Regions:
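A short, Lys/Arg-rich alpha-helix, primarily the initiator
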Residues: 1-11
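Short hydrophobic/aromatic patches at helix-to-coil boundaries
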Residues: 2, 61-64
Length: 64
């Protein structure tokens, strides 16, 4: 699954560790998400989008 996590995280000057803490997951989870090696649950996608200041999950994740 493609996503804009790295791009949006960089705009906010957040490290992977800082984003992970905001979301409540391990840094490795953020790494896997950014690389597209892990498909998040709906809840995790929502939490990541919220932590990145996105209005919609679709602003961060590309489904399909």
């Amino acid at each position: 699954m493609k996503n804009r996590i790295k791009e949006l995280r960089a705009r906010l000057n957040l490290t992977q560790d800082e984003l992970a803490r905001k979301v409540g997951v391990r840094r490795e989870t953020i790494v896997f998400l950014e690389k597209g090696k892990y498909n998040p649950s709906l809840q995790l996608a929502h939490d990541v989008a919220k932590a990145l200041g996105a209005k919609r999950i679709e602003d961060v994740f590309v489904f399909g």
